[in-house]
Amino acid sequence: MAAPTPSNRIEERSGHASCVRADADLPPVAILGRSPITLRHKIFFVAVAVIGALAWTVVAFFRNEPVNAVWIVVAAGCTYIIGFRFYARLIEMKVVRPRDDHATPAEILDDGTDYVPTDRRVVFGHHFAAIAGAGPLVGPVLATQMGYLPSSIWIVVGAVLAGCVQDYLVLWISVRRRGRSLGQMVRDELGATAGVAALVGIPVIITIVIAVLALVVVRALAKSPWGVFSIAMTIPIAIFMGCYLRFLRPGRVSEVSLIGIGLLLLAVVSGDWVAHTSWGAAWFSLSPVTLCWLLISYGFAASVLPVWLLLAPRDYLSTFMKVGTIALLAIGVCAAHPIIEAPAVSKFAGSGNGPVFAGSLFPFLFITIACGALSGFHALICSGTTPKMLEKEGQMRVIGYGGMMTESFVAVIALLTAAILDQHLYFTLNAPSLHTHDSAATAAKYVNGLGLTGSPVTPDHISQAAASVGEQTIVSRTGGAPTLAFGMAEMLHRVVGGVGLKAFWYHFAIMFEALFILTTVDAGTRAARFMISDALGNFGGVLRKLQNPSWRPGAWACRLVVVAAWGSILLLGVTDPLGGINTLFPLFGIANQLLAGIALTVITVVVIKKGRLKWAWIPGIPLLWDLAVTLTASWQKIFSADPSVGYWTQHAHYAAAQHAGETAFGSATNADEINDVVRNTFVQGTLSIVFVVVVVLVVVAGVIVALKTIRGRGIPLAEDDPAPSTLFAPAGLIPTAAERKLQRRLGAPASASVAAPD
């Protein structure tokens, strides 16, 4: 019998559903639902829209009275429901047009290591864990300096119209190209010049991003035996889950999930007990350098081992902790009804001289929030690990669009944890030590002089706040993570345990942050490896073999290159806190958003190439907005005459002090620190220029290719020919009645996937 082709697609309609077959002699590979929207559904969505509009009205226009945090949660939730049901559906029907009778890269290239068809629930867990890192936790906390209103609008609306769209569509074009990386797709679709720029620039950006994320993990876990023990235990638990699903009970995802959740909760609770034992404190209180080497080793192992053994189950397991904690915080908001202490729009939004970060609301609020609304890093995951695990094209909507929507909600909750804090305490936590001298008395004097609303803070108040969470001081605990932990403790102790458990919740939050961010390190390493393989393979010769995923020596070599790159920067940052990775922190947000510009450019061009010019506005509008934000921010960072904003102006001031033989200048307290600032600002300014040049080259190439395509003379679409699928799997996280019926007929575990017999 001849191999079936996509043209053999057969639809058998029954009521509001159709069974799709790739071959008449094989079982169905998909169920297409065509259920109309009933009156009950219409009433529900109208009610959601009305409630959402009311909530946004309260959030935006009630300025002269306190605003309850519940309103922001309600506004966000209603917006997500409408966005996923209607806007994501529009994109699916008009742009993506998924074909579940087409085999995905995981089915075609199934190699048991990188390409593995995986249950959609596990893929969703892996994908969410991989994309949700430091950005949605730290960015909104820092952006609270500008006020809660612009931050909440951008996090929610920006995600629905930009971030979710980017993730969904990058996943789509990668799946249609055998899971190719973003850099390779730039080369294939936009030409060699843009491709070289992307294949060189993107790995540099991703190396910086992974190193920054890893440093946040190291700082959170240093001298924290509870966190180290609990996170270490997730590794054997994940390996057990992977083997359980692979060999013992294939397809029993719900079963292994219950076991994994139980073991995870045991690891979290027992971590507190272990930390208070003599042997636990000795074994798990690790120095930053030791943690670096352990993290580097883990990153390499996670990228080498088969994806089903460690990466996917560990990310899936971590998702339960992530989503569970965020859900608990959301319940805490609804139960405690905390009042938002931050102003709707602060005076720092216009002045641009806030103590947390310098710069005006536009463009730096959008740069600071970063992954909470739009993230270029996500494009690497959507063209890295996720397309190589996906069972069906129909699952892309819930995983790509839904995964980013979930992360946006994480950012909303993170924003609220900072916004409900007394603003004097918020700025005490986030003001640079240059202004506070790490003293409660000096900090109180400084923040009381900022012109904040509310009662002035006293040194005793600051000391009591630190003691309530088991810390010696909370003064100048910059970076956002300590503020998030403090806000989480403030929220959770009101719901569970009272004041007596506030310190417990604070240290739990520290562990949660490390676990939350670590999953992006391992997935990012694997995604970066794919990009390095694609980039080097373009040189031809023996390097061409690197693009073959089955060539293990090449895969291992690329993994070593990636881990060595971010690992060396991580070690530099830990051993040299005034330089190294800290140099790259201000670049994190801009680089991430510039990467999103590259991804949206490729998406827009592909949509035009596929003859869907009418719908090119869907990725095109987010692209124009992202370019306006990032290029403006880059211009200011490169050319601003304000030394608190412009890299080169700051470089010139410190270089002048260096040449004058000064021993202290600005934030530098000695000559060595002055030298560090001179070096760091040079690196920052240079990388800013490089990143902008890369993005401009890609965008210009995209415009040229798009115009040629419209005129009928463009580069051909680099999409692989489809192959027929023999695998059935439900499209959504929850199977429909028709899908369940087919599953029972095929004899597979409830809601699992099943392959046609050979």
Swiss-Prot record:
Keywords: Cell membrane, Membrane, Peptide transport, Protein transport, Transmembrane, Transmembrane helix, Transport. It is found in: Cell membrane. One of its GO terms (biological process) is cellular response to starvation. InterPro entries: CstA, CstA_N. It is a multi-pass membrane protein. Its main location: membrane. The keyword Cell membrane applies. One of its GO terms (cellular component) is plasma membrane. The chain crosses the membrane at residues 42-62, 67-87, 122-142, 153-173, 198-218, 225-245, 256-276, 291-311, 320-340, 361-381, 401-421, 498-518, 561-581, 588-608, 615-635, 687-707. Disulfide bonds: none annotated. Belongs to the peptide transporter carbon starvation (CstA) (TC 2.A.114) family. Involved in peptide utilization. This is Peptide transporter CstA. It comes from Mycobacterium tuberculosis (strain ATCC 25618 / H37Rv).
